[in-house]
């Protein structure tokens, strides 16, 4: 018989930046539903937190990324509202998940600046904007189902996005980078993505480094003690109609351990600054005790 884990994780002392991030993630949950701020407003706040203003950006291709990012945030919000009104918005892959990933990605990008001495400010700014765009769109068109083939949903997201990126004036090179990064969010790619940056000087101008930040942002709310129980319950609900057996495993000791040990990987300097491995390892120890 499966052993189920408590939905009330023990309190954990968090580093100050992590505690601040958790506070903002919890504010999202308080707003979710009747007081929801909307993805476009959140997207603007992420740019503000990074100090990126379209009217002060010098590069035309970066301006295009910002415009497309904000436009798609509005479009995704509008589409999701229609889904929600028809009770069709996925339980996990909802606007709340995208908001989580945007907030976590913003924090990782901000902290990553401390670990880079790259003098090319404009290139870093461009990559940060691309990172936010991928955080917003990595699950574009997700219907709440499970991959039946490797990369099935990720490929579909790219196919749906390419025309929108083209219409948004995104360069061919950046369209390719966005799709590469989305394809690398496929779960079977994650461990290799992290291996690829071993012994590298971490630099988000390197696609492999930016990829790791996106992977970390994607699952961070499912690791943090104040948010993971709700995230796990939402994913189980979403998967219930597609694969009841897998859904039932998520909140068991075995299921949680498997996720923490195999999927919840953190290797960027920014994630180390947030203490994410310590948080994860503490929970693993508690589950094994």
Spell out what each predicted region is:
Residues 159-174:
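Post-HExxH zinc-binding segment in Zn-dependent metallohydrolases
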Residues 98, 150-158:
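Amphipathic alpha-helical segments in well-structured domains
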Residues 101, 127-145, 157, 180-186:
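His-Asp-centered metal-binding catalytic motifs of divalent-metal-dependent phosphohydrolases/nucleases
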Residues 2-56, 92, 104-126, 137, ...:
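Divalent metal-dependent phosphate-bond-processing catalytic cores, especially two-metal-ion Mg2+/Mn2+ enzymes
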Residues 70-104, 141-146:
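Active-site flanking loop/helix segments enriched in acidic
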Residues 152, 173-177:
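Alpha-helix N-cap and coil->helix boundary residues
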Residues 69-81, 131-135, 178-186, 213-217:
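Short alpha-helical scaffolding segments that buttress acidic/His motifs in well-ordered protein cores
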Residues 47-75:
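Eukaryote-specific, low-hydrophobicity, charge-rich regions
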């Amino acid at each position: 018989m499966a052993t189920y884990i408590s939905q009330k994780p023990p309190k954990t002392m968090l580093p100050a930046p992590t505690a601040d991030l958790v506070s903002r993630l919890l504010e999202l949950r308080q707003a979710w539903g009747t007081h929801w701020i909307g993805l476009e407003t959140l997207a603007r706040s992420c740019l503000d937190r990074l100090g990126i203003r379209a009217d002060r950006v010098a590069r035309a291709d970066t301006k295009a990324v910002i415009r497309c990012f904000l436009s798609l945030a509005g479009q995704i919000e509008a589409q999701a509202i229609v889904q929600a009104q028809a009770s069709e918005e996925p339980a996990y892959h909802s606007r709340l998940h995208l908001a989580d990933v945007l907030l976590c990605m913003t924090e990782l990008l901000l902290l990553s600046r401390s670990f880079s001495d790259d003098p090319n400010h404009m290139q870093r700014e461009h990559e940060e904007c691309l990172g936010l765009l991928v955080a917003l769109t990595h699950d574009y068109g997700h219907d709440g189902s499970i991959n039946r083939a490797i990369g099935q949903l990720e490929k579909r997201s790219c196919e749906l996005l390419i025309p929108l990126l083209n219409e948004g004036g995104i360069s061919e090179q950046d369209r390719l980078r966005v799709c590469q990064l989305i394809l690398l969010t496929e779960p079977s790619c994650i461990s290799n993505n992290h291996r690829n940056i071993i012994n590298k000087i971490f630099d988000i101008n390197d696609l492999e480094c930016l990829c790791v930040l996106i992977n970390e942002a994607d699952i961070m709310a499912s690791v943090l003690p104040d948010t993971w129980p709700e995230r796990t319950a939402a994913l189980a609900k979403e998967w219930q109609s597609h694969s009841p057996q897998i859904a039932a495993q998520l909140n068991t000791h075995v299921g949680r351990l498997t996720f923490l040990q195999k999927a919840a990987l953190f290797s960027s300097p920014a994630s180390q600054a947030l203490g994410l491995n310590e948080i994860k390892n503490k929970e693993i120890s508690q589950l094994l005790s």
